[in-house]
């Protein structure tokens, strides 16, 4: 079997990723050592924090690009794991990877066995993983939204944003999602189930948002920054709460 990999070709210059930042390569499967698992990547999570790793030099040219994964055990020399088990690990952008003792290129992480009968294995890098925990902690733990309050969530169609929207609805709040294009707005309305959504690309964005908040905003889940934050700030009520999760703009 061949291991297909995306590696960092150069330290990014800034702004948006460019195809010249990455290089495709193939090679042999790595040799497995005691205490390790050889796993096949099934799902890969692409997250905004990865871009920061590359721009800051945590990843250097030649490194396999970082990424959390759901994988299946191909070969095991680690107690408690067998061939065929599904695990949450950090294979990165490659078809196969080693997990376990002595693996440090992504920072050591214990492989976690997944129960495919309890939930879809893909949820380990979604609602039951880092994305879900971020939304849960940022919204419910930090902001403690109350029934009837107005909650605004930026980048609402993203991985963290869509979970935060649903948690706010479960809490009995009136939820306004901010996103970009029409496809994302339709997703928020038809699938996520927000009460209202508005595009930050609209020329009348600030006026539209203000109209949707006649009684102000009680909770703001910040993922964007920039002009979106500036539009929400005047709408915040006394004793309102803000979670700053990211500044992707």
Question: Which sequence ranges carry the predicted segments?
Answer:
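NAD(P)H dinucleotide-binding glycine-rich loop of Rossmann-like/cofactor-binding domains
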Residues: 65-72, 83-155, 197
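Mid-domain Rossmann-like dinucleotide-binding core that forms the NAD(H)/NADP(H) cofactor-binding site
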Residues: 125-203
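Short SAM/SAH-binding signature in class I
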Residues: 215-221, 240-241
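Short glycine-centered segments of the SAM/dcSAM-binding site in methyltransferase folds
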Residues: 86, 150, 174, 240-242
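Glycine-rich phosphate-binding loop and adjacent beta-alpha segment
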Residues: 188, 227-249
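Glycine-rich beta-strand-centered segment in the early N-terminal region that forms part
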Residues: 28-46, 52-93
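Short amphipathic alpha-helix with an adjacent loop that forms part of the alpha/beta core around
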Residues: 204-215
